[in-house]
């Protein structure tokens, strides 16, 4: 799905997404990402929600956003409290959503000037 937004050079904006890719400022990625408004997207080595560990959130924690939006794939799933305990201890809120809702919510909060992070889990690309 293409989003009709006004991307800026200043902020990292989700400009499109499908089940197996995400587009940030018109650049397509086919791997999981961590996105923050003022930082270039970072590859996130997570390809399966069920394999998440607390360690996977350290890169987000280091950026100290006010809120992490976790895109859990094609359907909404909730992270176990022990996985996000270190984020909560640092007063970083965590919201879990399917990827489409996560992308839309990130854009809205980013446009409002909120210090938000988006972590999107994409499936491993199929190799032939």
Q: Locations of the language-model features?
A:
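Short acidic loop-to-helix transition motifs that present clustered carboxylates
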Residues: 99-104
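Short active-site-adjacent helix-start/loop capping segments
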Residues: 42-44, 76-79, 105
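Active-site-proximal loop->helix
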Residues: 82, 108-109
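Non-catalytic interface/targeting segments
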Residues: 1-55, 63, 111-128
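Mid-chain, well-packed structural core segment of small domains
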Residues: 61-97
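Short, charged beta->alpha transition segments
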Residues: 53-59, 105-106
């Amino acid at each position: 799905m293409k989003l009709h937004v006004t991307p800026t050079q200043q902020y990292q904006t989700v400009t499109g997404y499908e089940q197996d890719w995400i587009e940030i400022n018109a650049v397509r990625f086919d791997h999981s990402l961590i996105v923050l408004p003022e930082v270039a997207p970072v590859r996130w080595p997570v390809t399966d929600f069920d394999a998440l560990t607390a360690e996977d959130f350290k890169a987000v924690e280091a950026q100290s956003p006010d809120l992490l939006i976790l895109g859990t794939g094609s359907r909404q799933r909730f992270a176990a409290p022990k996985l996000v305990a270190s984020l909560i201890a640092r007063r970083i809120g965590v919201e879990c959503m399917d990827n489409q809702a996560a992308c839309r919510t990130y854009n809205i909060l980013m446009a409002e000037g909120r210090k938000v992070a988006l972590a999107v889990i994409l499936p491993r690309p199929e190799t032939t």
